[in-house]
């Protein structure tokens, strides 16, 4: 007996982008000089995404998070990473990504919270844990909390003294 072929339920970003062609022509008589309303285009794109991607499709939500991050759509990226983090195998990396975005925005408290959530993920590798300890040390250092920074940098040192510039940071 043959097994039925697996259905591909993954999100097709290219198809969704091509659906934007249905957005309609731009009214050349508007004061925008024929420019497309980018926010309206993205709103249509995101609506198409919501219709096509199940909340449980962690891979697609992760991929969308990465794409939105690269486009500078930080809030949308954070939402997608939060949805993708419901998959235990992606929880750590999603919280790490969220922490890095918060850090880039200068939101140190949110970065710390995200990194700690990553540490609490049940499924994480030793490398992921090491990176989170380092990022927590770095974030506490940026927050002018040298004691807490040293605590996390020392955790990194005990596991891998050659990790990044941790030896210099502990001195």
Task: Go through the PLM ranges and name each one.
Residues 1-79, 89-91, 100, 105:
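Intrinsically disordered, low-complexity acidic segments enriched in Asp/Glu and Pro
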């Amino acid at each position: 007996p043959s097994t039925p072929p697996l259905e591909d339920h993954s999100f097709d970003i290219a198809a969704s982008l091509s659906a934007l062609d249905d957005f309609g022509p731009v009214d050349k008589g508007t004061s925008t000089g024929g420019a497309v309303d980018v926010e309206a285009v993205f709103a249509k794109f995101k609506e198409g995404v919501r219709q096509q991607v199940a909340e449980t499709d962690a891979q697609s939500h992760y991929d969308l998070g990465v794409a939105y991050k690269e486009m500078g759509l930080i809030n949308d990226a954070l939402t997608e990473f939060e949805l993708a983090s419901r998959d235990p195998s992606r929880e750590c990396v999603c919280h790490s990504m969220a922490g890095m975005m918060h850090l880039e925005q200068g939101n140190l408290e949110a970065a710390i919270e995200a990194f700690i959530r990553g540490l609490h993920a049940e499924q994480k590798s030793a490398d992921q844990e090491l990176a989170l300890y380092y990022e927590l040390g770095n974030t506490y250092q940026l927050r002018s909390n040298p004691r807490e920074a040293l605590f996390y940098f020392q955790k990194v040192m005990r596991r891998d003294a050659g990790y990044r510039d941790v030896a210099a940071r502990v001195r």
